[in-house]
Curated annotation (Swiss-Prot):
CDD domains: CYP_LDS-like_C, linoleate_diol_synthase_like
Cystine connections: none
Annotated consequence of substituting residue 306 to A/V: Slightly lower synthesis of 8R-HODE. Little effect on epoxyalcohol synthase activity
EC number of the protein: 1.13.11.62
Key words of the record: Calcium, Dioxygenase, Fatty acid biosynthesis, Fatty acid metabolism, Hydrogen peroxide, Iron, Lipid biosynthesis, Lipid metabolism, Metal-binding, Oxidoreductase, Peroxidase, Prostaglandin biosynthesis, Prostaglandin metabolism
Catalytic activity, reaction form: (9Z,12Z)-octadecadienoate + O2 = (8E,10R,12Z)-10-hydroperoxyoctadeca-8,12-dienoate
Recorded phenotype for the gene knockout or disruption: Decreased prostaglandin (PG) production in triple ppoA/ppoB/ppoC mutants. The triple mutant is hypervirulent in the invasive pulmonary aspergillosis murine model system and shows increased tolerance to hydrogen peroxide stress.
Protein name (Swiss-Prot/TrEMBL): Linoleate 10R-lipoxygenase
Disordered: region residues: 1-66
Entry annotated with the keyword Lipid metabolism: yes
Length: 1121
């Protein structure tokens, strides 16, 4: 009897392990007196406390009858005597509830929760909004199910799995420089397997060789002669250029370097980490570095094997070297968050040595991450798009292995990569050697061996290569190629490098497929066949089956050419016996397909290479998990980032224009699409409707701009507008299309003077100036009120982004009825901030297009916004004349009338009455005026505020604040002088113009000759501190003659005189001067970061510090209420 009671009340948890989500009884169990009783218990359930369901029911007032509550006990009392086991106990049978029984425990809200859970798991499901408390509702749902519910267990398991999968196990990203930077030998890419993919580790094997091969394989020389040897050159069917295959050579040598002393060893890393540039191991890396400012030795690269390749391979390496050195210069100048701060001067010798070493190391390693980022983006968006023929489409799709995947069945990333012997063979693309490179290789044999390649034995070849390698200087900066000579600074001449690159762009590569390998490479290919046999790699069919491809059943399937198929049959007897390497070379090549097949490789290679590309990139932690702005810096991440709206993501032009800024036009097809020959590119772009986007002439040297810094020359260029015009070239036609003819009239002095005279007669000067002053004061004060954020008793406002940049926008919108969207005009087209960005982009494109790498994207962005803006203005002018169907819409822009709007309407109507057409008014008068005025005024305002809040100018702030509270003509004059002095002392910009004349000038005691067509840049920074013109040049003085100031950006702008800008800036300074205790915001937000640029001007950092702007974009200040 005691045993029966013991088995009756024993806890289930004592019998077996608890399942997820299954609750055990809360009653105390009778001690188990027999360990053998674990599986033999009474059917009577143990007494337990009420479940959550019972609690819920009781709270609802649903009382449970005693008969229901103790039904199991009553049932047991009527049960027959247990006799199912030898010791008189019942066999235990686990009973679970059905779906219908579970559903009875759930409410309507629970079913809604289930629906949301299912929706979140569907493909394309949105991220979970945790404000809906979905996770907590899941907990509620599961807790309401019975303890013996199978669905409770399944839901609990799913919940646990999701929580587990939310975090990586083990973590793949760690803190510290050991993991933040790439190691020299590629180790630590996967921290849990630190030697995976490192240099000097063994090759992996991709497929097991299971097929029993014949005892005697064909002679390698015979294989070459019958399957490999090129009889005639076959140009690539898609006209892919040699540059594509040179880039492929970089990739191949980046991840494969067989140790010929131990061919199972790979001496380089298994990652695309540019070890060809930086070195395979630390000792090699030390030889390429200067150990100063993070730089590499000029025009040098580590990999000596590339010296034996066609010279353009080396040119590409030099370009990457130059980009690295450019990148570290920018990193040091920006110094994001103090990451690259130079050591203090007061350190001890030992401390200083360590600090400078760390400074160099941080710059070098971050520069490497950035340069690798450019390298991989070119590989994915220029090189890979060419492989699959996406360059012949306008599609922005790309097979980017770094894609962020959502869901439970996603491809892992950052796990590492180990190169295999099979892919070492798969990447030998000698068939694609161009006719030019074939001839070059023959000449190399003659020069090194003294006889034709056909007469060079294998022994002689190996000895000759060994001798060549031994004679190469160990110091990369001492090496050269293509008989080029280094200059005094260690660099090669740009002209020599560009000629090699351009020739390669125009050089069509060879075709894949059987009998396309140059005979000059016979010994090289024999070595490859022999090595593949020593590696015991699987057969061609085994390789195909590994990738899910149908194995070849006949030789004709391998290659439909009867002669090639017969040669294969004679050599191998059966398709299963065809070796991997000879097989992938002798296979039939795919025919081009748009998109799909670009480089037309052989069939097996086409599939395998894409898998390897994904493995190489997705397996690399530095291209996936740790590829982010924090590691590359905001500037570095942005600089190498692709833009799908530009060339569908292709970015080779960034490398070309940074390396050779004076050779490639910003829109040169040679820079944008170098992996297909230009003549074929022209056909492609014509079909795509993009032919006009590019220039097609062969790159030529463009003299660098003439930089002038003296006051006399600055004044000359600023005032002689007929001799120095805006350097916009063909830009106006590209941006404004058919309206460009009218826009150019803005530079016609006769046209401007004629209509300025008309305007002066139409305007009441005194009344106009009063209206401008009142408007600017009111709008500035209103923006200060609306945009100020108050927290912790402090008022803070972005005085640049929310006040200085918007005030002239609102002014222009009122005068010219710009389609501005605001609270007052909700039917507008552009918001105030958008309008400023539009006008700033157009100004930059038309008047300050200096950075060639940024020029092409800038032109396309300007084209996208410029023409629509001009058309909107023209429609508005027509509306004022009452002749436009859109007059009702554009009248809404003027619903909120004020004096300035009335002036604008009046002037427009008068111009129409004076015989000017709406098209001419909009494109030759209004649009050029707005583009020139708005950004320039905004820039000047920020320069003024920045100066008087700086250490140098803050002593004048009390006087400005005193004058701001006065409303007299004298206070206006004094405030204007404060404005002009601040601009003089704080203007780091300049003028960029094109000369229309021949002129000889003296600048800083140097004779400079300027020719027609020369680009000229004058910097204001030095000119404005010329002591001969400005006595006490560093001081603010209010008595300087007005005509001594050089500030052409402040006007005149069309019919708006320079006085208009002067009044505007004075009014804005007055409004700001009325703020109490005005000061800069603490920290970086209160710093107007300027980066010095070549030529004596400074660029501003954008708010995210990711790129430069000629206009300030953000500057926060604080003031008291």
């Amino acid at each position: 009897m005691l045993r029966r009671f013991s088995s009756t009340f024993k806890k289930k948890g004592d019998r077996e392990s608890k399942q997820n989500g299954t609750a055990s009884s809360s009653s105390a169990a009778v001690a188990n007196t027999n360990n053998n009783d674990n599986k033999r218990h009474s059917k009577i359930s143990a007494a337990r406390k009420s479940s959550s369901d019972d609690d819920r029911n009781e709270k609802k007032g649903n009382s449970v009858s005693p008969f229901e509550k103790y039904a199991s006990v009553l049932h047991a009392s009527r049960s027959p005597i247990p006799n199912q086991t030898g010791d008189g106990a019942y066999l235990e049978h686990e009973h679970t509830t059905s779906l219908l029984q579970d559903a009875r425990h759930l409410g309507f809200k629970d079913f809604k929760t289930l629906k949301e859970v299912i929706e979140s798991k569907l493909p394309g499901g949105q991220l979970i909004d945790d404000k809906t408390m979905l996770m907590e509702r899941i907990i509620q749902l599961v807790s309401r199910l019975p303890h013996n519910s199978k669905h409770r267990e399944e839901l609990t398991n799913a919940f646990l799995t999701e929580l587990w999968d939310s975090l990586p196990h083990p973590p793949l990203s760690y803190m510290g420089n050991d993991y933040a930077y790439r190691s020299a030998d590629g180790s630590n890419n996967n921290p849990t397997l630190p030697r995976l993919g490192a240099a000097n580790t063994l090759y992996a094997r991709t497929i097991p060789p299971l097929i029993i091969q014949p005892g005697g394989l064909p002679d390698p020389g015979l294989v070459f002669d019958t399957l490999f040897a090129r009889q005639t050159f076959k140009p690539h069917p898609n006209k892919v250029s040699s540059v594509f295959f040179y880039w492929a050579s970089l990739i191949i040598h980046d991840i494969f370097q067989t140790d010929y002393k131990n061919p199972n060893m790979n001496k380089t890393s298994g990652y695309l980490d540019l070890s060809i540039l930086y070195g395979d191991v630390q000792e090699e890396q030390n030889l390429i570095r200067t150990f100063k400012d993070g730089k590499l030795k000029p025009d040098s690269f580590s990999e000596p094997r590339l010296q034996a390749f066609p010279a353009t391979c080396c040119v590409l390496m030099v370009m990457l070297n130059r980009f690295h050195n450019y990148a570290v210069e920018q990193l040091a100048a920006i110094n994001e968050n103090g990451r690259f701060t130079k050591p203090a001067d007061n350190l001890s010798e030992e401390e200083a040595k360590k600090a400078w070493a760390k400074y160099d190391e941080d710059l070098f390693q971050t520069g490497r991450l950035i340069t690798c980022g450019l390298y991989i983006n070119i590989t994915l968006y220029d090189y890979l798009r060419t492989i699959v023929n996406l360059n012949r489409t306008n599609s922005t799709w790309c097979l980017d292995p770094r894609a962020q995947m959502e869901g439970s069945h996603t491809a892992p990333s950052g796990l590492g990569n180990q190169c295999s012997v099979e892919f070492n063979l798969a990447y030998r693309w000698h068939s694609a050697t161009s006719a030019t490179d074939e001839k070059w290789t023959e000449d190399v044999y003659e020069r090194l061996m003294g006889k034709p390649a056909s007469e060079v034995s294998m022994t002689e070849l190996l000895m000759g290569l060994g001798k060549y390698q031994a004679e190469l200087p160990k110091d990369p900066s001492k090496r050269t190629f293509a008989d080029l000579e280094r200059q005094a600074d260690g660099r090669f001449k740009d002209e020599d490098l560009v000629n090699l690159l351009v020739n390669a762009v125009e050089d069509v590569a060879g075709s894949f497929g059987a009998r396309n390998v140059p005979k000059v490479l016979k010994n090289v290919e024999i070595l490859g066949i022999i090595q593949s046999r020593k590696w015991n790699v699987g057969s061609l069919n085994e390789f195909r089956k590994f990738f899910g491809l149908k194995p070849y059943e006949t030789f004709e399937e391998i290659n439909s050419d009867p002669d090639v198929a017969e040669s294969l049959r004679s050599l191998y007897d059966h398709p299963d016996f065809v070796e991997l390497y000879p097989g992938i070379v002798a296979e039939e090549a795919k025919q081009p397909m748009v998109p799909g097949v670009g480089i037309a490789p052989t069939y097996t290679i086409s599939r395998a290479v894409l898998s390897d590309a994904v493995a190489l990139v997705r397996g690399d932690r530095f291209y996936t998990i740790d590829y982010n702005p924090r590691n590359l810096t905001n500037w570095g991440y942005s600089e190498v980032r692709y833009d799908l709206s530009i060339n569908q993501g292709c970015i080779f032009y960034k490398l070309a224009t940074r390396a050779f800024p004076n050779w490639f036009k910003p829109d040169s097809i040679y820079a944008h699409y170098p992996m297909t020959i230009p003549s074929e590119n022209r056909k492609i772009m014509k079909d795509l409707g993009r032919e006009i986007h590019y220039s097609w002439d062969r790159p030529q040297y463009t003299p660098p701009r003439v930089d002038l810094v003296s006051y006399s020359n600055a004044k000359l260029v600023a005032e002689q507008q007929n001799q120095f015009r805006a350097a916009w070239g063909d830009t106006v036609e590209f941006v404004f299309g058919k309206a460009s003819k009218e826009f150019k009239l803005y530079q016609d002095s006769a046209f401007i003077q004629k209509h300025a005279d008309v305007m002066s007669k139409l305007l009441n000067k005194e009344e106009w100036h009063r209206s401008v002053k009142e408007f600017y004061e009111d709008i500035t004060a209103k923006l200060l009120e609306d945009k100020t954020r108050r927290f912790g008793g402090i008022n803070q406002v972005d005085i640049t982004n929310d006040v200085g940049n918007l005030t002239p926008v609102i002014f222009a919108a009122n005068v010219f009825s710009l389609p501005l969207k605001s609270k007052e005009n909700p039917r507008g087209i552009y918001t105030e901030h958008e309008m400023f960005k539009v006008l700033a982009a157009l100004y930059n494109c038309l008047y300050f297009d200096i950075d060639k790498t940024k020029s092409y994207p800038l032109h396309h962005a300007s084209q996208a916004v410029g023409e629509p803006l001009g058309k909107a203005l023209e429609a508005n002018v027509k509306a004022l004349g009452g002749s436009s169907l859109l007059s009702g819409i554009f009248r809404s822009f003027r619903e909120n009338k004020n004096a300035l709007k009335e002036y604008g309407v009046h002037l427009t109507k008068q111009l129409l009455e004076n015989g000017l057409g709406a098209h001419e008014i909009a494109w030759a008068q209004f649009l050029p005026t707005v583009i020139a005025m708005v950004p320039a005024q905004a820039q000047a305002f920020t320069q003024i505020v920045d100066f008087y809040l700086s250490k140098e100018g803050s002593k004048h702030l009390p006087a400005i604040q005193r004058l701001a509270k006065q409303d007299t003509k004298k206070s206006d004059e004094q405030l204007l002088h404060y404005c002009l002095e601040a601009v003089r002392l704080n203007d780091m910009s300049g003028l960029y113009r094109q000369s229309e004349t021949t002129l000889a000038v003296t600048d800083e005691a140097v004779e400079v000759t300027i020719q027609p067509g020369d680009k000229v840049f004058v910097s204001f920074a030095k000119a404005n501190r010329d002591a001969s013109v400005f006595p006490d040049p560093a001081e603010v003085r209010l008595d300087r003659p007005m005509n001594s100031y050089i500030n052409p950006t402040l006007g005149p702008h069309g019919f708006l005189s320079k006085e208009t800008s002067h009044i505007a800036l004075t009014a804005m300074l007055r409004a700001v001067g009325r703020l109490n205790n005005l000061r800069v915001a603490p920290g970086v937000q209160g710093q107007l970061k300027k980066i010095p640029q070549p030529g004596g001007y400074s660029a501003y950092l954008r708010e995210d510090h990711g790129s430069y702007s000629i206009f300030p974009t953000t500057f926060r200040v604080q003031y008291d209420a």
